[in-house]
Amino acid sequence: MLDIAMPKIEVVTAAENYGRFKIEPLDPGYGHTLGNALRRVLLSSIPGAAITKIKIEGVFHEFSTIPGVKEDVTEIVLNIKGIRLRSYAERPVKISLSKRGAGVVRAADIDAPSNVEIVNPNHYICTIDRDDAAIDMEMTVERGRGYLPADQRDALPIGEIPIDAIFTPVPKVNYVVEHIRVGQATDIDSLLIEIWTDGTIKPGDALSHAAQVLVQYSQTIADFNRLSTEAEPTTAPNGLAIPADIYDTPIEELDLSTRTYNCLKRADITKVGQVLEMDEKALLSVRNLGQKSMEEIRDKLIERGYIPRIGQTSHAARAEIEG
């Protein structure tokens, strides 16, 4: 295998929510290869925290109004989506807001535990325009990746309002590839990548995390031949063996809805084999994964031949039983 010259990384600009990084020298074509891959991972796979639902005292749905508050609930929800925070807890965390009397309500008025940090305390939420008015609100903070629409979650109790959760802390990434001269070669790539964050993560840390994600996926591919020859079939609860190639299939291959996919990912269920090892009771115990999502998973597994239809035995299952 030919050696690949390792590039150097230079920090061109380093700020709290903006960074420019130069990576060079790169073999011809590798500027776009790395730049595009890093950009996609930065925009989709960096973990973050967001408010996923709220409950306002005296309010039963998002189309309500609050006496003495200038904005209606729909506007308040839109403003809350802009609150950026860090959560150091693995589980959902409750934060609260209680404000009385005329005045502007900002993110700084939120009462949060020590494991939640609000990074834009001056963010505007609403205005109370009467001295005898008040707003009391409870919010739920969760960690996740990417974007989770409010309409792709299981039904909530009356009074709890779901919010589109923007988990990603990296809203924008640009990259430029230029040719530089190294010795006699004039077609060497130089990659300049710009990263904007929401302040909850430093651009350099985001770049490092994105690279680690790519390394993990690449390592799996690099180890493919060794793992495929060494791996022993896994046995599911129904007693049938799960071949290694099926076990290691990413759940993305099931083409699940965003809601169901995010439920599994948050529970660290990333492979089809992990799903096949779980019975219905175990699946329903996954947070926010309800009966509808469980049935969707079952239908997708049947559709791809991983499990037999009810009342039928698949070819693989029949061969296993007869053997």
From Swiss-Prot:
Key word Nucleotidyltransferase present:
yes
| Cellular component terms per the entry's GO annotation | cytoplasm; DNA-directed RNA polymerase complex
Which Pfam families does the record associate with it? RNA_pol_A_bac, RNA_pol_A_CTD, RNA_pol_L
Gene Ontology biological process: DNA-templated transcription
Q: What would you give as a GO molecular function for this chain, any one?
A: DNA binding
Record field: catalytic activity: RNA(n) + a ribonucleoside 5'-triphosphate = RNA(n+1) + diphosphate
Q: What class of enzyme is it?
A: transferase
Annotated segments matching region Alpha N-terminal domain (alpha-NTD): 1-225
Tell me the domain comment.
The N-terminal domain is essential for RNAP assembly and basal transcription, whereas the C-terminal domain is involved in interaction with transcriptional regulators and with upstream promoter elements.
Q: What is this protein called?
A: DNA-directed RNA polymerase subunit alpha
Task: State the organism of origin.
Answer: Roseiflexus sp. (strain RS-1)
